[in-house]
């Protein structure tokens, strides 16, 4: 066992050769490297699989022995300063390593087909492998300096991946927005690290916690300064995990390829903030105000993310706001001191959200056969609907992921979310009411996304391809109200390419992508419908290839069974609570005397309540959306609900207010744009003016005046020495007279 721990340092470095070799290959042997590009995908999966096996081995040893292993090397040694590098293997490290590697492998396999059309295929896999290296380095770090180094590497990789299609202006703006927003949090993190080093004199976690606890117990620190440093540390987690108020970058991050969204939202970038708070929880616990602040930020994010997801048309943006809300649940649990519940929900949410994103990618991939490469069309749920019979495997997988996120048993997120909801009653009834209400909102918007995407009719076919007036049938509303107004104001259905109707796609179509031809023939940076290998043009979407469906099906298994890891089956001497063994010793401020057993009566009572709330949200979604999509024969029923009356007008005002709030992102982006972005630009323009006209103007003006004076003097002189002597004595006499009169 000791030998296994000694070689754990290779965990973050195993995926690193792939991006290095790809870079060297493209530099020195570009043609050969591109022609063998699938070999690099295989190597990426292989190396990450080795890391996964190594991580599983470490986790088994963690479960059996509950040991913590740390190894350090002295890097800088001075009289009063020393800096060590090393790695730390504990339950948190092993959990995060398995999470990163399993989700990462599924995303890499999926990406081989999803990105096969793109000429940036090799660059994509290089970024992905470097992303995995950065995140694995972050979770194995043994001190705050290493945390910060890998924290910045994670940010850089995410910046490159969000802006992967950098020639699209919207993608370039999205990665800039993510970069700038995270700079705010990262600067706070750096200041917090320096502040705690000034207090304790150490960057190492083991020394930092011990010294700080001693200082607190002896009342030898300034609590105001300590709280400020803790808030600055937490600011890094707020930005990275898209917590309010630094959440604005997350929806725009959907401009990257869909596999990137799956990895960022499931196991890497946004999970980094949760990991940081979990790692530093022993530090935060002894500062009561910071724990309250963490829980407050968490509950605000929970509710805000859910409300902003209510009216999204873009399927990926809807999932992004869902991620924001679920991360809020994790942050709330950490703020309450419920360490186990937070990590449990991190695990279950990662697999469920990866499943949903890969499922949405499969839907987008199939929709592109109809609308071409245009994210505003292929990701628009208004143009979807009726996909059940065309993509049945994707539909079933997405449905299971939806039910999991809604908290329906026995799927994964039910078990973890229920723990957080139950613990919230012990912490604060107000927070509990908000958290439980948001569970209903989660069920509503997730079910809404499912219905808009898969149920009813394929809405894109309600267009008149001849260019004549559209059909008189009702338009489909994203929000569930009369569609004509909304459709005209917020979106317009697209005019499609002419499609043949004699072709149908099989559910498992065996399409072979010719890599060499793709590399040479792709002259545009983005996917175009003409570059699909299919010789037939489909008038309906078709199911994705096996290489895309395989990771989705594996994630379905995780979604079905990973929740059982955390069920505390500790009855009658049978101890099957694997997660509690894994996390021993665990921190739980709400159940200090708990032995992790469960009162099944209380559990069932709470479960019935939570499932009832989720079921109510699902029912409302079906009530608003299902009748519209079921059949045109229900028009009389629909019309009965749209009769104008006082109650209807009042209801519409409320509904429109909620819609405007959600569709406009809570006006937070507009506020930042008006008061921060515009203000900063005006300040920059003023600084530019002051620098050029005042700072540079003074020395330039002096130089210019000297030049003109010299020119005047030069023109006066005629080259005669007698003239020079005359002017010299004249100036001397003038200055002597001035001195004489002013002196006396």
From Swiss-Prot:
Classification via InterPro entries: NADH_UbQ_OxRdtase_chlpt_su5_C, NADHpl_OxRdtase_5_subgr, ND/Mrp_TM, NU5C-like, Proton_antipo_N
Quaternary context: NDH is composed of at least 16 different subunits, 5 of which are encoded in the nucleus.
Enzyme class: translocase
BP terms from Gene Ontology: ATP synthesis coupled electron transport; electron transport coupled proton transport
Naturally occurring in which organism (per UniProt): Gerbera jamesonii
PANTHER family (UniProt xref): NADH-UBIQUINONE OXIDOREDUCTASE CHAIN 5 (PTHR42829:SF2)
Molecular-function GO term, any one: quinone binding
Membrane-crossing residue ranges in chain numbering: 9-29, 40-60, 89-109, 125-145, 147-167, 185-205, 219-239, 258-278, 290-312, 327-347, 354-374, 396-416, 425-445, 549-569, 608-628, 724-744
Entry's family note: Belongs to the complex I subunit 5 family.
Location(s) in or outside the cell: Plastid, Chloroplast thylakoid membrane
Catalytic activity, EC: 7.1.1.-
GO cellular component: chloroplast thylakoid membrane
Signal peptide: none
Name of the featured protein: NAD(P)H-quinone oxidoreductase subunit 5, chloroplastic
Function summary: NDH shuttles electrons from NAD(P)H:plastoquinone, via FMN and iron-sulfur (Fe-S) centers, to quinones in the photosynthetic chain and possibly in a chloroplast respiratory chain. The immediate electron acceptor for the enzyme in this species is believed to be plastoquinone. Couples the redox reaction to proton translocation, and thus conserves the redox energy in a proton gradient.
Membrane topology type: Multi-pass membrane protein
Gene3D superfamilies: 1.20.5.2700
């Amino acid at each position: 066992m000791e030998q296994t721990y000694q070689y754990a340092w290779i965990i973050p470095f195993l995926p690193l050769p792939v991006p290095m070799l790809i870079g060297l290959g493209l530099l020195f042997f570009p043609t050969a490297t591109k022609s063998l590009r699938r070999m690099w995908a295989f190597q990426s999966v292989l190396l990450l699989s080795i890391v996964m096996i190594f991580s599983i081995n470490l986790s088994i040893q963690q479960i059996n022995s509950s040991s913590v292993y740390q190894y350090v090397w002295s890097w800088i040694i001075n009289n009063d300063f020393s800096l060590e590098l090393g790695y730390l293997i504990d339950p948190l490290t092993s959990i995060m390593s398995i999470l990163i590697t399993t989700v990462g492998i599924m995303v890499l396999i999926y990406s081989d087909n999803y990105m096969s059309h793109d000429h940036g295929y090799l660059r994509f896999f290089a970024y992905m492998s470097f992303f995995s290296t950065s995140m694995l380095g972050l979770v194995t770090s043994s001190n705050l300096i290493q945390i910060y180094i890998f924290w910045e590497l994670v940010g850089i990789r995410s910046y490159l991946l969000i802006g992967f299609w950098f020639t699209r202006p919207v993608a370039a703006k999205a990665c800039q927005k993510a970069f700038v927003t995270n700079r705010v949090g990262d600067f706070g993190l750096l200041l917090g690290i320096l502040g705690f080093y000034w207090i304790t004199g150490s960057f190492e976690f083991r020394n930092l916690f011990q010294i700080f606890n001693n200082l607190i117990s002896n009342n030898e620190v300034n609590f105001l300064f300590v709280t400020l440093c803790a808030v600055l540390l937490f600011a890094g987690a707020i930005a990275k995990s898209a917590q309010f108020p630094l959440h604005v970058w997350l929806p725009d991050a959907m401009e990257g390829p869909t596999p990137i969204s799956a990895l960022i939202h499931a196991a890497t970038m946004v999970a980094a903030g949760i990991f940081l708070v979990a790692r530093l929880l022993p530090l935060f616990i002894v500062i009561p105000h910071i724990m309250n602040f963490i829980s407050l930020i968490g509950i605000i994010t929970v509710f805000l993310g859910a409300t902003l997801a209510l009216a999204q048309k873009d399927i990926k943006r809807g999932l992004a706001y869902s991620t924001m809300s679920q991360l809020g649940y994790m942050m709330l649990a950490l703020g309450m001191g419920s360490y186990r519940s937070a990590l449990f929900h991190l695990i279950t949410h990662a697999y469920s959200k990866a499943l949903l994103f890969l499922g949405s990618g499969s839907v987008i991939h199939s929709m592109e056969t109809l609308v071409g490469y245009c994210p505003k069309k292929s990701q628009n749920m208004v143009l979807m609907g009726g996909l059940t019979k065309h993509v049945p495997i994707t539909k079933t997988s997405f449905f299971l992921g939806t039910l999991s996120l809604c908290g329906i048993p026995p799927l994964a997120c039910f078990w973890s979310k229920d723990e957080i909801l139950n613990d919230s009653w012990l912490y604060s009834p107000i927070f509990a009411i908000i958290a439980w209400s948001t569970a209903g909102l989660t069920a509503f918007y997730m079910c809404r996304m499912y219905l808009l995407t898969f149920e009813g009719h394929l809405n894109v076919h309600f267009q008149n391809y001849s260019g004549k007036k559209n059909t008189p049938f009702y338009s489909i509303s994203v929000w569930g109200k009369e569609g004509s107004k909304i459709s005209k104001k917020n979106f317009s259905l697209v005019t499609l390419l002419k499609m043949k109707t004699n072709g149908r796609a099989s559910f498992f179509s065996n399409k072979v992508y010719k890599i060499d031809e793709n590399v040479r023939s792709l002259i545009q940076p983005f996917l175009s419908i003409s570059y699909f290998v299919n010789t037939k043009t489909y008038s309906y979407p078709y199911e994705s290839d096996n290489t895309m469906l395989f990771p989705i099906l594996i994630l379905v298994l995780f979604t079905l069974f990973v929740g059982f890891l955390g069920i505390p089956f500790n009855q009658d001497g049978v101890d099957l609570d694997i997660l509690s063994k894994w996390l021993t010793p665990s921190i739980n401020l709400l159940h200090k005397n708990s032995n992790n057993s469960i009162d099944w009566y209380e559990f069932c009572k709470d479960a019935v309540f939570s499932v009832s709330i989720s079921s109510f949200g699902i029912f409302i979604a079906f009530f608003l959306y299902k009748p519209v999509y079921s059949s045109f024969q229900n028009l009389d029923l629909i019309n009965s609900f749209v009769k104008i009356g006082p109650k209807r007008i009042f209801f519409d005002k409320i509904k429109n207010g909620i819609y405007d709030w959600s569709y406009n992102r809570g006006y937070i982006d507009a506020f930042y744009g008006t008061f921060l972005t515009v203000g900063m630009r005006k300040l920059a323009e003023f600084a530019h003016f002051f620098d050029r006209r005042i700072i540079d103007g003074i020395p330039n003006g002096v130089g210019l005046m000297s030049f003109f004076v010299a020119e005047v003097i030069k023109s006066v002189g005629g080259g005669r020495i007698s003239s020079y002597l005359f002017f010299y004595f004249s100036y001397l006499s003038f200055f002597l007279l001035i001195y004489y009169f002013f002196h006396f």
